[in-house]
Design a protein with these regions (language model features):
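N-terminal Rossmann-fold NAD(P) dinucleotide-binding loop
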Residues: 67-68
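Residues in the short beta-alpha loop(s) of Rossmann-like NAD(P)-binding domains
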Residues: 63, 86-88, 132
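Rossmann-fold dinucleotide-binding core
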Residues: 134-192
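Rossmann-fold NAD(P) dinucleotide-binding segment
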Residues: 93-97, 101-142
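Hydrophobic Val/Ile/Leu positions in short beta-strands of Rossmann-like dinucleotide-binding domains
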Residues: 59-60, 104, 172
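Adenosine-cofactor binding site in Rossmann-like domains, unifying the SAM/SAH pocket
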Residues: 81-94
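Phosphate-coordination loops involved in phosphoryl transfer and adenosine-cofactor binding
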Residues: 51-56, 98, 125, 167
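N-terminal hydrophobic or amphipathic helices and topogenic motifs
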Residues: 1-56, 63, 72-80
């Protein structure tokens, strides 16, 4: 609760000044403690039901920066993970054809090409999503190159260096969802932070 944290920081800063200490130093120390506490709470995760979490998720570009973040996110929620990347034996198409959820986590300049490659091979009823900062072209490509799938574009408002998703924001653009994937994804994201 950010209001309680703010009040705590103000109180500790005030007490530090009363003791002749620099309030900003004490506040900085308490910010680190509060961050560590939030991070630990996020690592415990909110309870996500097995029905919600038991999916096979293919991370296309899973060995890259954002791919690793997505792998951690979905694996911590007890999903089965398939990773395809330049250095894996499984191909993008093989991974996509086996998955309930296909996450495109490749560099921006490769996103459209990869969507064109895997979109036609996604299972009917599956979710095709991306984690690209641009939304218009990837969402349009996912719509055009996949049939019978739900299409959700996401834009994580953070980079691959984050330690946890606690307090992070992700913009979601749900273009097509006839299978309840938007609720599933939102549940997973809230459960992780």
């Amino acid at each position: 609760d950010f209001v309680r944290e703010r009040d705590l920081l103000e109180d500790r800063g005030f007490r530090a000044e009363q003791m002749g200490l620099r309030s900003e130093v004490i506040e900085s120390l308490f910010r680190v403690i509060l961050w560590a506490s939030r991070d630990h709470q996020a690592s415990l995760g909110a309870e996500v039901s097995k029905e919600t979490a038991s999916k096979t998720v293919a991370i296309i570009g899973g060995n890259g920066g954002m791919g690793k973040v997505m792998t951690r996110l979905f694996s911590e929620a007890d999903n089965n993970i398939i990773i395809s990347d330049l250095d894996t034996t499984i191909t993008n198409v093989e991974a996509a054809s086996q998955a309930d959820v296909v996450v495109i986590a490749v560099p921006i300049e490769k996103t459209i090409d990869v969507i064109q490659e895997v979109g036609p091979h996604c299972k009917a009823g599956s979710l095709l999503m991306d984690v690209t900062s641009t939304k218009s072209a990837p969402v349009k490509a996912m719509r055009d190159y996949s049939k019978g799938t739900s299409v959700i574009g996401t834009h994580p408002l953070f980079g691959p260096s984050v330690h946890s998703l606690q307090g992070q924001r992700i913009a979601i653009v749900c273009l097509r969802d006839e299978h309840g994937w938007d609720e599933w994804l939102t549940t997973i994201l809230h459960g992780r932070g």
